[in-house]
Amino acid sequence: MNNILVINGPNLNLLGKREPDMYGNITLENINQKIKLHFKNEDLKIDFFQSNEEGKIIDKIIESQKKYNAIVINPAAYSHYSIAILDAMRSINIPAVEVHLSNIYKREEYRKKSVTAEASLGVISGFGYYGYIMAIEFILNNLVREK
């Protein structure tokens, strides 16, 4: 069985309430359910983790290489400045795909740069919750199934 960890960063626990014009009314729990439902017929275990604390996210990234084939990460605001998360992602020997619900390139200038993307295979941005599904499909089709 393949194991994938989905990591969500700060304020994503507020989805459904926070900036509905930007993110819609979907909650993080709804997103997690949609992801699980989409992959229900796969030989795949998906775990979910969310934290508003940078250190907890770093610890989870470092621990992930013991249990998971890959990670999907939405570092949220940390993507724009967290060298610590970047370094943690570089330190693990499993692939990562970065996801953003909104198109960060259509937002404020300070949101258009993702330092954490440097440690990711790629970035999926602007497709809402479906970006997580796209990331997992990429991982399964290009990294896990070919082994």
UniProtKB/Swiss-Prot annotation:
One of its GO terms (molecular function) is 3-dehydroquinate dehydratase activity. GO terms for biological process: amino acid biosynthetic process; aromatic amino acid family biosynthetic process; chorismate biosynthetic process; quinate catabolic process. The active site is at residues 23, 100. Pathway: Metabolic intermediate biosynthesis; chorismate biosynthesis; chorismate from D-erythrose 4-phosphate and phosphoenolpyruvate: step 3/7. PROSITE patterns: DEHYDROQUINASE_II. Its EC number is 4.2.1.10. It is an enzyme of class 4 (lyase). Substrate binds at residues 74, 80, 87, 101-102, 111. InterPro entries: DHquinase_II (IPR001874), DHquinase_II_CS (IPR018509), DHquinase_II_sf (IPR036441). Keywords: Amino-acid biosynthesis, Aromatic amino acid biosynthesis, Lyase. Signal peptide: none annotated. The record marks 18 as: Transition state stabilizer. It catalyses: 3-dehydroquinate = 3-dehydroshikimate + H2O. Homododecamer. Belongs to the type-II 3-dehydroquinase family. Catalyzes a trans-dehydration via an enolate intermediate. This is 3-dehydroquinate dehydratase. It comes from Clostridium botulinum (strain 657 / Type Ba4). The gene is aroQ.
